[in-house]
Amino acid sequence: LTAAVGCLHGMFFIGSGRLYGTSGSFLRERALAGYDSIAFPGEDEDEFFRLDLYNTLDNLGMYWHVPNIQAFHSIVPNSIMEFYPYVGVKRDVSSKPEVNNYALRPLLSVKYLAVSQSEKDAENLMPGYTFSFSQFGYDFYENENYLPMGFGYTTGVRQSVLDTAPLSLRANVMLEAVGLSDEAMERNADILTELESIDYASLNASGMEEAVEERRQ
């Protein structure tokens, strides 16, 4: 039993990476200490939201027991394997959306961004984030464009039109309109306005904010 525990302990540290400290202080003081202990301001127990993490241990959100969009996992649902590449995120066993894909965050209901306090200029990583609180060596920034799950649309876009958008801009379009097959678009024509072409001039930070405000209504 002792040998088995020692083996698992060694595998744990190798898997976590030596980058985070040979003494294990990072895992003890930041990762494990945050398990079920991260306190988000005004948190509603029934509210679902995701966390984003910048330039840190991939699975830190899992240690903290908080749903997140950055992870390293060998067992990945097909839906994720299909969705992430579609919106310009490299997908293998690691999910690491880049900060230039800022519109993906509200689309995935990201409410907070955690950044190590050693990082500089963190407040400018993505548009629409304001400092909220600090805990376990991280500064947490709240996403002003956070969208709770279950938002609705008044506009639809045919999949064939959505497919013409560059990968890095598809999340922007998907905030403005829900992607539908031709049959679904025609079936819902009485309740959805069709986005027949993409206005690329609106696919920026301001356009994202406007789309988020529309989804909130």
What is the predicted function of each stretch?
Residues 2-71, 141:
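Extracytoplasmic
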Residues 69-107:
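Luminal/periplasmic acceptor-recognition loop/helix of membrane-associated glycosyltransferases
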Residues 26, 77-82, 89-90, 141, ...:
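Short, surface-exposed, polar/charged, turn-prone segments marking secondary-structure boundaries
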Residues 5-11, 15, 83, 87, ...:
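A generic secondary-structure signal for well-formed alpha-helical elements
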Residues 71, 104-217:
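Flexible, solvent-exposed extracytoplasmic
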Residues 30-41, 96-101, 117-119, 124-127:
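Short alpha-helical segments and helix-capping/turn motifs at coil-helix boundaries
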Residues 32-39, 81-85, 166-175, 192:
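Generic detector of well-ordered alpha-helical segments enriched in charged/polar residues
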Residues 14-27, 67-70, 86-93, 151-162:
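Charged, low-complexity surface segments at secondary-structure and domain boundaries
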